[in-house]
Amino acid sequence: MPKSSKKPLSILLVSDFFYPRIGGVEVHIFQLATSLIRLGCRVSVLAHHHKDRQGVRIMGNGIKVYFNQLISLHDDTSYPILYGCHKVLREIVIKDKIDIVHFHQGTSVTSLECVLHSRTLGLRLVYTDHSLFGFGDLAEVNINKVLRSVFSDVDQTISVSNIARDNLILRAMFNPYKTNVIPNGVDFTKFKPDKELQKKKNSKDITIISVSRQAYRKGTDLLIEVIPEVCKLFPNVKFVIGGDGPKKPLLENMIETSNLQDRVKLTGALHHNKVRDIMIKGNLYLNTSLTESFCIAIVEAASTGLYIVTTDVGGVGEVLPDNMVKLVNADKDSIIKGIKETIENYDNIKDNTNDFNEVLKDAYNWDKVAHKTIKVYHKAMMNLDRSIITRIKKVLAIGKISGIFHVCLIILDYLLLLFLTLYQPVKSFKKEKQFKYENYQKYLRNMK
C-alpha cells in the first residue's frame, strides 16, 4: 500500500455518532479511520458514550476511541454545555499529538463544541457534511445560524456530493474555495453479489429490498403507499424491509390492514454486517427518500447485484451510472411506474447486474477516499493566519448580536485554557506509546 510522501498526520475524528451505534455517519467515520491508518496516519476518535461504552477503547484495526461521558439527550446525543469537552479534548490533543480535528455532522453537539475549543488550542479544522438541510422551518434556520457562526473557525470542508456542497455553501455562507467534494466509500469485500443466486433470478419471482431508518426523511410514508399498490399489480412480488425507526408501527399497520403478512417481511434493525445477507436475496432495491446528500445504501445494493429504483432527490442522481438505476419523482405514482417498468424489463436488465460490483469498486474505494481526505488535511495545514484578531474579525462579520455573543464565548474559552494550563501543565502528562499498525498486522499474520 503506497503511503503519502508527506509527514504522517495525527488525526482526531469527532462526532456524537460512532460505533456501537449503526448508521451512515458511524460507518463513514469507522471506514475512513481504518483507511487513514493503513496509509500511515495516527487516528483517534472522540464520541459520545453509548450504554456500557465509556472511557478509552482500542478497536481491532488500531482506532483509539475516547467515549466522552456527558449528559445524554435524544438518540444518545450530548447535552449542549459548551465547555464540557474542553478538558477532555485538550488531554487528547496533548497525549496523541493531534494535528487535525476532523468533525462530522452539523447536528452533533460534541462536534460543534470541539470546533470552538480546537481553534483555541491552535489546531486545524476540517468538517464533513453528511446531510442536506433546507431553509424553511425554525429548526433548519437555527442550525444554519449555528453553522455560519461555527464555520468562521473552519479551515476546509468536505461534502459527499456536489449538491451537498452547494447546500452547505448557501446554509453556512462558507468560502466556496475551501470546499471539497469527496464521495462516500463502500467496503466491496463485504458487498459483493452471490453468483449462484444471481443465476437463479428472473422476472417470475421478484423480491424488492428496502433498507433504511423508518422515518419521514427516508420516505417511509411513500413506501407505505406504494407497497399495497405494487402487490396488487404483481402477484409474484414480495418485499423485504430492513431497519427500524419511529415510522415502523405505521408499516406494521399497513401490512395488517392490507393482509400482506405473506408478502412483506420486516427484519427490524440490522447490523451493518448483516445488510448484504438481505440484499443478495433481492432483485430490485427501492429507495424512497425525500432528501439525501449521497445515499450509500444504493451503492451497497448495486454492488451486490441489485438494480436500483430510487427517488431523484438531493445528490442521488450523481451516485450511479444510468444503466444501474431508474430515477423517479418523489411521489407514489412515479415510484409505482418506475417499479412496473423495471419488473417488466427485468430479464433484459438482469444480465448487466453481474458487472455492477467491478464498475463501482474503482469509483467508491475507501483508500481513494482516504487519499483525497489527506490532501484536504494538507490544505488545512497551509492556513497560516491563526491569530486571535483574525478570528474575532471573522466572528464579528457574522452579525452584531450573534458576533458579540460568539466573541464572549471565545474569550471565556481562552480563559478556561489559561486555567487548565496552570492547573494541569503540558509537562504533567505522561508520554503514551503510539499504536503501530505495521506491528499489529505482523502480529495477526503470526497468529495465523
Region spans (language model):
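Nucleotide-activated donor-binding/catalytic signature segment of Leloir-type glycosyltransferases, i.e.
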Residues: E252-L270
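Short alpha-helical donor nucleotide-sugar binding micro-motif in glycosyltransferases
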Residues: A269-L270, D277-G282
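Conserved donor-binding/catalytic core segment of Leloir-type glycosyltransferases
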Residues: L12, K200-P228, V240
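Carbohydrate-associated surface elements
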Residues: H49, I163, G185
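Conserved acidic donor-binding segment of nucleotide-sugar-dependent glycosyltransferases
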Residues: D322-D333, T342-D347
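Aromatic "clamp/platform" in nucleotide-sugar-dependent glycosyltransferases that forms part
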Residues: L290
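Short hydrophobic beta-strand element within catalytic cores of glycosyltransferases
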Residues: Y307-T310
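N-terminal subdomain of nucleotide-sugar transferases
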Residues: M1-R53, K64, D367, M382-K448
